[in-house]
């Protein structure tokens, strides 16, 4: 049975149980109980997670919402150029495991959310896609699954997935992973 490692922020934490339920009879699905937060945090913690979970066959990973978050109301936590450099380093570490790596784009916020700007989220996603293309890593375009449906798929906190969003995004992840099993 192939081992799938799910890494990412709280959006990943939203859909991970759905993915586990759908794939547990076809693959060993493992995931950090910890929020992988922003790219620099993932880069720092990745060696420990790989040690804990062992070598995966497949990694489905995302970072970006924390990086694009305006915690102080002024600027994103991580400048997009730094975000891209950190993703590059994470990509290299993940590829060195021999796993098939899939990067998931960040999902949008509801437009009325003052802490995120969807134009910026798209800018971060474009930077991420460029890094992944350069590294031969497939991209799961989760932004597109939610875009246009933010009111239907996101909670009242304006950023996290609700039940319907978990099903839609979770199924998009299952579909990509199923093709690799």
Q: Which positions does each model-derived feature cover?
A:
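Catalytic nucleophile-elbow at a beta strand-turn-alpha helix junction centered on a G-D-S/GDSL motif
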Residues: 2-17, 38, 68
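Conserved donor-binding loops in enzymes that form glycosidic bonds
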Residues: 9, 34, 159
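Alpha-helical cap/lid subdomain in secreted, periplasmic
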Residues: 2, 22-28, 43-181
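Short beta->alpha junction loops
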Residues: 31-38
